[in-house]
Structure formats: C-alpha cells, structure tokens
Amino acid sequence: KNVLDYFIVQNNEYRFVTKDFGIVSSFMRMTSELFFIHQPYKLKEGRIVYAVSGQVTLSINLIQYTAKKGDLLLLAPNSIIEMHEFTTDFEMRMMAIQNDFIQFLNKDEVLEYYIGRRENLFLPLSEKDYEMTERYFFLIWDTVHEEVFRKEVVQSLVSALLFNISY
C-alpha cells in the first residue's frame, strides 16, 4: 500500500505526506487502511510516535510493548511492527521521516543518532517533556500547512524536537 495514495485514508485532514516526510495528527480519526490488528508491517522509514490517550499493545521486532499516554517511540527504518490490541480511547501522533530528509545534518546528529542506528527507543516522557513534545508537534503540523511548504523549517523543527528529548 502506498501512503501517498490519497484514497488509502478516509479523513486526509489528519495527515500530511510528502515523499520524504509525513505527519499524522490523529491516527484514529484518520481511519486508515494501513494497519490492521495482528498484521505485521515493515517500516520503510524512521518514525517518531507518541501516545496521546488510551493504551496499545504492540510488537516491535518481536519485542512486545504496552504504550500509554506520554510514551514515545523512536522507530528505526526496517523495523517490523505489529499491533495486538488497543483500547477504544487509544490515540497517537506520528511522524515518518526518510533518512534523506535529514541529510543536511551531520551523520552523528539528531535523527541519525536516534533513528539511523538500528535500534528502537521506547521512552516514557515526563509530563513536562510530553507537553513540550505536543508543542513541537503542533508547530511542525502548522508549519507544513502554511501556504508555502518550507522543507528546511520542518527539518529544523524535527531536529529541535529530537534534541529536546532527554533520556
């Protein structure tokens, strides 16, 4: 399935997708046909995902996790994910980032540091870090919806978000 296909999602107002960057403000309201329960899915690009409400049980490269509000996942390209179950109030936000999207950075920095390595990171955020992540997310969301898409601004904001994550 091609995420650039406009018809793969019923409510496109909850997502913004280019060939090297995607952002989803409401995974559940988007009503996607990309993921199904108990269907493994191989990620082509790195992902920044965080839970906003509810709870989900999923496997990432055969390791099971339970994510709830405030949990952030940094997923490496080529990871295999499978959703097992989620509560009816589960909601998450997500960004998908191709490695080419962040080539302007030094290899040891930002996304390469987190997602470019072949590891995944599951990080429970403090309330302060969660609120800051929300602010960064919606600043990026608002920026991609400007009349003119400024890729460099989005790249810098994504970098700032990742630099701000402390663990």
Identify the role of each PLM range.
Residues 62-76:
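Short acidic-glycine-tyrosine-enriched beta hairpin
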